[in-house]
A protein has these predicted regions:
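Hydrophobic membrane-insertion alpha-helices, especially the h-region
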Residues: 5-21
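N-terminal Lys/Arg-rich, disordered targeting/topogenic segments
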Residues: 1-2
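A structural signal for short, hydrophobic/glycine-enriched beta-strand patches
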Residues: 23-160
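A transmembrane-helix-recognition feature enriched in membrane-embedded lipid enzymes
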Residues: 151-175
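Structural signal for membrane-spanning alpha-helices in multi-pass inner-membrane proteins
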Residues: 19-24, 169-173
């Protein structure tokens, strides 16, 4: 009985370490020139700021945003008037998978070979998985730390959502 308890504890620790490596400390790619910088939906906050920093460094000529009309800065960028092209997507229903599908179509139409996906660090693994399935070029992921700026309840909720989404994305293998 004692061995079973030890084995269960070991599995729990290993699973926790795996989830932490995938959701809390995911790998981000090296930022290199690309065809577009992409910011998926959700509260854009720090992700949008990081994307705008990349655009200011001229790493890509196009910024792709989820055009959800709930965020003033996103609305402003979608109206244009900036030094780079902004493409605003509105996939229905709004989901990471549908955003990845929309980007896949857009990238195919435009002949893109590489995009930089800027999202929260907790979302990098799942979003990267889905965008790589739907976009036929290279997807470089850039994670932005956001869990430090939210409460414990929201952080746990976000981690649980991403863990479930990552499990679903691993089972449902289509774009």
């Amino acid at each position: 009985m004692r061995r079973v308890g030890s084995a269960v504890a070991l599995v729990a620790v290993l699973l926790s370490m795996l989830l932490a490596s995938l959701l809390i400390w995911p790998r981000s790619g090296t930022v290199v020139p690309a065809d577009a910088v992409v910011v998926p939906s959700g509260d854009p906050g720090a992700r949008l700021e990081r994307a705008l920093q990349l655009m200011a460094r001229n790493v890509a000529p196009t910024l792709v945003l989820d055009g959800t009309p709930d965020f003033a800065r996103v609305d402003e960028l979608c109206r244009g008037g900036v030094a780079f092209e902004v493409v605003c997507l509105r996939p229905e229903p709004d989901s990471t998978r549908n955003e990845a599908r929309a980007l896949g179509r857009l990238g195919k139409d435009r002949g893109w070979r590489r995009v930089i996906l800027v999202t929260s660090s907790v979302h990098v693994s799942r979003a990267g998985l889905l965008f790589r399935r739907c976009f036929k070029g290279e997807v470089v992921t850039v994670g932005v730390a956001v869990l430090r700026s939210v409460g414990i309840r929201d952080a746990v909720r976000a981690l649980a959502h991403e863990a479930g989404g990552l499990a679903h994305g691993s089972v449902v293998r289509r774009c």
